[in-house]
Amino acid sequence: MDRRRIRYRIEYGVFQIFLFVMRCLPVRTANQMADGVAWILFHLIPRRMTRYQVARENLQRAFGNSLNDWQIDETIHGMWRHLFRMIVEIVHLPRRLRLYNCLDILDFTGRDDCVKAMCSGRPVLFLGGHFGNWEVSVNTFGHFGFPMSVVARALDNPWLHQWFRQFRESTGNRLIDKDGASSELMRIMERGGMASLLCDQDAGRSGLFVDFFGKPASTFKSIGLLALQYNALIVVGGAWRLPDAEQAGARWNRFNLTTEDVIDPADYQGVNGLTELTQRFTTSLENLIRRAPEQYFWVHRRWKTEPNTRRKARAA
């Protein structure tokens, strides 16, 4: 057995122990543990190991002078609290979120617009980002009888990947490997199906540059092209955790499942239609993130690729 397989087995064993411990703990205690780990990571772990500078630069790029140093640090600390709470929520999700108790756990914003899109008979692309708890979103749609195909990168550890596959498909959703997803997405669109994917990943030099928080960000063209080719509606949304002040008396964490925007590609048939469509869903995601900035993954290098004009100016 090679070292990699040994490491994978150890990782999976540790993960199973973590699952057992988290399932045994009350919700409040599990949240407190998540907050404690976030405090240690933010205050005690060397910042070069936690990509602190990347998060800080991203926040400064997104919000400019509207955030002072203290507010930036509070947002980064809040981001880590959110991420560790999300891990705990994923462990609890299969037993805590059921169809009969959805209204106790979820508030809905824009629900009617989302339902109309799903019942339109047209293919639908659900777009989200590294924001809130995206697992709650797709899990909820499965419970309500609207299963969809979820595009995600395969995990390196095959045992962990299988666990997450079973978790994501437990409510009827289907997992699609990000590598080679294009052909499968086209088949889904041809059948009038629904698919969910992230739209805030850097697309490299071949991407389409549109503004994200007022700064040009390379964005995949494929989303807009799919929508335009197959007349697919685009629904931008996500599930974000409600503030602690609104959690009082709840048996589990509560979320707002928000439909931020529903976009019809028929409105973008002009010469610049692809750019305008891509800009609209990117702006919609930005508006969603502004609802709870601390629940966005700011260590994600969204602005990694610079436009050609900026690269040429730097080289001159």
Regions found by a protein language model. Give the residues of each.
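Soluble or luminal CAZymes and related metallo-dependent hydrolases
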Residues: 13, 51, 106, 177, ...
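Non-catalytic C-terminal accessory region of glycerolipid acyltransferases
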Residues: 2-6, 28, 65-69, 77, ...
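Short, flexible loop segments at the rims of nucleotide/cofactor-binding pockets, characterized by
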Residues: 100-105, 153, 170-176, 213-214, ...
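Membrane-anchoring hydrophobic helices of lipid-metabolizing enzymes
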Residues: 1-128, 172
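Short Gly/charged-rich anion-binding patches and loops
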Residues: 17, 54, 112, 136, ...
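Catalytic core of membrane glycerolipid acyltransferases/transacylases, capturing the structured
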Residues: 93, 120-179, 205-208, 212
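Active-site metal-coordination segments of metallo-dependent hydrolases
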Residues: 48-54, 154-158, 217-220
